[in-house]
Amino acid sequence: MTTTHPWGTQPEMFGPRHEHRLGIIMSEVRKLPAGGRVLDAAIGLGQLAGRVRGAGYRVFGIDAAFEAALHVRRSLGAIAVVGDMTRLPFRDGAFGAVTTGETLEHLDDDAGAAREIARVVAPGGACIATVPALRSLWSASDDYYEHRRRYARQELVELFGDAGMQVEKAAFWGFPIVLTYDTLFLLPMNKRRARREVARDAALQSVARAGRSRALVGLVRAIFALDRLFSWIPFGPGLLLVARKRG
């Protein structure tokens, strides 16, 4: 099966917001027992998987897109398969952890995916997930990214609780700085991307180049990190979940 999306190679897949979110996930990954087997679902272009492997874990991946799985095999040498998150082609308890970043919101059957994640995680293992938060923040960016939903905190907790996992953390992130970035920069860019081809738009090409500037991305990420000063506020554009399988 081949699945492609217009947003899959856009600058924000490489830019500061994406890098910041990967850092949030990795802060939890590094708490896992060393050397374990980690499934990244969906693996996408492999940015998270590469970091997980670099931290000393054995990485496996699944994605609905053949191109994504092939790219990861070639670029990382990791085992990556094409498949459906509601029917994971792995045995029960195969992994010490599953990571899933900005994926559940795309699925018609997110509950089925949560049950499958719980099935393939070993007893005592963890799922580390990020999703967009709060219906009140729905925008044209969600339409552009083909989201099915944004999550309330309790909805995410119940999703994994009903799948048989114990939620250890369900925390908002990204307020106020990332949310301001989303509103003032990312939303106008996504509206423009929805109407125009990057190859024919000088402004979008400039944004793409900026999104690949390590210095600029690092600077903006440092600014985003200031959001941690406001982490006590139960609000933000994203949610981080850590859930553990009862064992």
For every predicted segment, state its role.
Residues M165-P176:
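Conserved S-adenosyl-L-methionine
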Residues A111-A126:
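A short glycine-rich, Lys/Arg-flanked "PGG" loop and its adjoining helix->strand segment in the class I
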Residues A243-G247:
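C-terminal beta-strand of the catalytic ATP-binding
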Residues D182-K191:
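Short, electropositive alpha-helical surface patch
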Residues M1-R91, A97-G101, A111-A114, R150, ...:
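Conserved N-terminal segment of class I S-adenosyl-L-methionine
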Residues S136-S139, P176-Y181:
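Short catalytic/ligand-binding loop motif for oxyanion handling, primarily in non-cytosolic enzymes
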Residues C127-R149, R153-E158:
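Short, glycine-/aromatic-enriched active-site segment of Class I SAM-dependent methyltransferases
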Residues E102-H106:
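A short His-aromatic
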